[in-house]
Curated annotation (Swiss-Prot):
This is Inner membrane protein CbrB. Residues 33-36, 105-125 are periplasmic. The keyword Transmembrane applies. The keyword Cell inner membrane applies. Its main location: membrane. The lineage of its organism: Bacteria, Pseudomonadati, Pseudomonadota, Gammaproteobacteria, Enterobacterales. The gene is cbrB.
Amino acid sequence: MSVSRRVIHHGLYFAVLGPLIGVLFLVLYIFFAKEPLILLVIIQVLPLFLLMSITTGAIPAMLTGVMVACLPEKIGSQKRYRCLVGGIGGVVITEIYCAVIVHIKDMASSALFENILSGENLVVRIIPALLAGVVMSRIITHLPGLDISCPETDSLS
C-alpha cells in the first residue's frame, strides 16, 4: 500500500471512529469512577455529547491517524509499539489542539467549549484520547480498505 493511501486510510478511520471510542470510554469512566446517576443525565443529552466529542476530537484523532500511518516499518509493524505511539500521540495532539482552541477566542466563545477545554477537565480529555489512540492503533490493520495481501513494506523516504 502506498504511503499516501495509508495516510488517508488511517486518518479517516481515526477521525470517524476515534471520538466515538473516546466517548464510550468516557461514559464508562464516569459510570465507575463518579456517581452512576450522572450517567442518566449523559444519556439524556447523548446526541449533544456525541456532537461535542466529534467537534473537539475529530481533528486530533485524524492527526493521530496520520502520525500512526507515517510510522517507520520497524515501529509500525509491531502492535505493541504502534499502540504505545498511538496512545501517547493521541494525548499530545489533543492537548496541543485544545491549547490552540483556547487561544482562539471566537471558537471558544461558548460556555460549554470553555468548560470542556479548561485545565480543570484534563482527565476528561486525556482518558478518551489515550484509550482511543491505543484501540484505534490496535484495530486499524483489521479495518476494511487495507490491502492485507500486500504487507506494508514501503518506506517513507
